[in-house]
Amino acid sequence: MPTKNENLNIFFAASPLHLICINEFRKERNINKYKLILFLHKGNSHALQQMFLTLKELGFKKYTIFWIPKNKFLKYLSEIFLIIKLKFKSSKRNLLFLIIDFRNIFMQSLRRYFMNAEFILIDDGFYTFVAHEYF
């Protein structure tokens, strides 16, 4: 049974740039124990190939793949089950989440369900172009 002082680091990635940011963060903070969750779509084989090549290049050996369903209702249910699973595994631990998209509803819901956790947003820089055009 985990103790209250035990840390649990949960990292999310959906692109090779996220993996690079996670790797830099992990090295900077000297984090060896973590849970890496990949958000992937089955439809784009080239993107999947790039993710797996980046995982191999950076030395990530342990990770969980969360396949994103195309159906929005199934996606919602899958995300709820993931939150429940994380809730059970994280009881009595200090949590740190590396989230990948501040505009993502799932990432925001994590903040509601894990109020005492630390959240750090990693930025792959893609929204900069959208924000520049919009604002």
Where are these predicted regions, by residue range?
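Active-site and donor-binding regions of nucleotide-sugar-utilizing enzymes
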Residues: L8-F135
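Short, Lys/Arg-enriched, disordered terminal segments
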Residues: M1-L8
